[in-house]
Design a protein with these regions (language model features):
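Short catalytic helix/loop segments, enriched in acidic residues and glycine
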Residues: 15-34
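ATP-dependent carboxylate/phosphate-activation module, predominantly the ATP-grasp catalytic core
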Residues: 198-260, 283-307, 323
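Nucleotide-activated donor-dependent transferases that construct or modify glycoconjugates
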Residues: 1-19
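Peripheral (often C-terminal) accessory segments that flank ATP-dependent C-N-forming ligase machineries
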Residues: 145, 301-386
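Glycine-rich phosphate-binding loop of ATP-grasp-fold ATP-dependent ligases
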Residues: 134, 155-183, 204-208, 226-242, ...
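A short glycine-rich, hydrophobically flanked beta-strand micro-motif that places a catalytic Asp/Glu
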Residues: 263-274
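ATP-grasp fold ATP-binding core
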Residues: 123, 149-171, 190-202, 207, ...
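Conserved N-proximal alpha/beta basic substrate-recognition cap immediately N-terminal to
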Residues: 44-140, 147
């Protein structure tokens, strides 16, 4: 099968952006998994990445100049995997749906999931096990936000109604921090509203699922390393990860996926505290956990099975995989040849104030920590880490 992987950031559609490192890592992982499954892979690559001699394992790599280029490729392939920020994914998916087979969530599902308020309401109605933390949808104005925060008490989380992942999300401990949090939402959101939610303690986890027309197949529970202080950011995770509530979460994830009519790979973010499982959001697209899972299962075969509606009844996970995003110290010597000599580096930094993303595998959960420490030392020896 000829498959076009259109990853927005690494294609250069957004220019030089902080999303490049994570975007290229996902592109490389998807291309590798599809190639390993015997498929012909087409993709775009940002010229600035190509000039560094960094290329994903694809059969045909082209330079993006306009959406017309994408439309030409779509007319000559059997299927497409679109990956983009949530506020851009809807239009991109609509274009794919008009041209070829889609490996991913349909546009109508993306539209539903892009509105956190709507998603919370659906989950509240259909969920047996998941709790939706207390929240309110408010305008991008200081007074109503201050009033609601005073009502529910600090700390609170302020985030865009239409955001994805940790983008534009802030942990707020006092009313003096609210103005800056609203500004941050306005920078990344196309909506004129935000969500204020009571902050909940717990372990950050996600459930990865893959969906076809007739089946929802839970793949794994994943740990998530989230930096909780002011600006909230994702730093990586481990897949699979033990969870005593796995069976209940798998059952509930199937239920939510069916109600939202998800397709392809998707992730459900959760907060687990004792017996309480709090729902955070649905990511209707391939997430960073896919990279870790590609170390322990045949993800390329599963992606194609979505189009063919031939998902297996279950999957075997061979060991444990992990993704870690390392922030780099300022003023380091950016030597790509040295960085890429570290095989675990799946995506190098593309700016002097960027990050690098590594992917490791181990037969045991405890071995993952050792593998991460080994790579961390290699990066530190190169002078990239503090």
């Amino acid at each position: 099968m000829k498959i076009f992987v259109f990853e927005y950031a690494s294609a250069g559609v957004l220019g030089a952006t902080p999303l490049l490192t994570e975007g290229y890592a996902m592109l490389k992982s998807i291309c590798s998994s599809l190639s390993a499954a015997g498929h012909e892979v087409h993709t775009f690559l940002f010229s600035e990445i190509n000039e560094l001699g960094i290329r994903p394992p694809a059969d045909k790599i082209e330079t993006y100049s306009s959406m017309h280029d994408a439309e030409k490729i779509l007319s000559h392939v059997d299927a497409c995997i679109p990956i983009a920020p949530d506020n851009l994914l809807y239009d991109l998916t609509k274009m794919v749906e008009a041209k070829t087979s889609l490996i991913g969530c349909p546009s109508k599902s993306i539209l539903s999931c892009s509105n956190k308020d709507e998603t919370y309401k659906i989950v509240s109605e259909v969920s047996k096990y998941f709790d939706v933390p207390e929240y309110e949808t408010l305008p991008l104005e200081n007074d109503p936000v201050v009033e609601y925060c005073s009502e529910i008490g600090f700390p609170v989380v302020i985030k865009p109604v239409d955001g994805s992942g940790c983008e534009g999300v802030s942990l707020i401990n006092s009313k003096e921090e609210i103005t800056d949090a609203i500004k941050k939402v306005s920078y990344v959101s196309m909506a004129k509203k935000l969500i204020v939610q009571k902050f909940c303690e717990g372990e950050h986890m996600s459930c990865s699922i893959i969906c076809s027309k007739s089946r929802v197949l839970p793949l794994s529970m994943n740990s998530q390393r989230i930096k909780i202080s002011g600006n909230i950011s994702y730093l990586g995770g481990i897949s699979p990860y033990p969870c005593v509530h796995k069976e209940e979460i798998f059952e509930e994830s199937k239920n939510i996926a069916q109600n939202l009519e998800l397709s392809g790979f998707a992730g459900i973010d959760l907060l687990v505290s004792g017996d309480k499982i709090s729902f955070m959001e649905v990511n209707p697209r391939i997430t960073t956990s896919f990279i870790a899972l590609s170390n322990v299962m045949r993800t390329g075969e599963l992606l194609v099975s979505c189009v063919e509606d031939s998902l297996p009844a279950s999957v075997n996970l061979n060991g444990f995989g992990s993704v870690v995003i390392f922030p780099l110290k300022r003023g380091y010597d950016l030597d790509y040849k040295k960085i890429l000599q570290i095989p675990e580096v799946i995506s190098p930094p593309f700016s002097e104030e960027g990050t690098t993303l590594i992917s490791v595998k181990s037969p045991s959960l405890y071995g993952i920590v050792d593998e991460i420490n080994v790579v961390q030392k290699k990066l530190r020896d190169l002078g990239l880490l503090c």
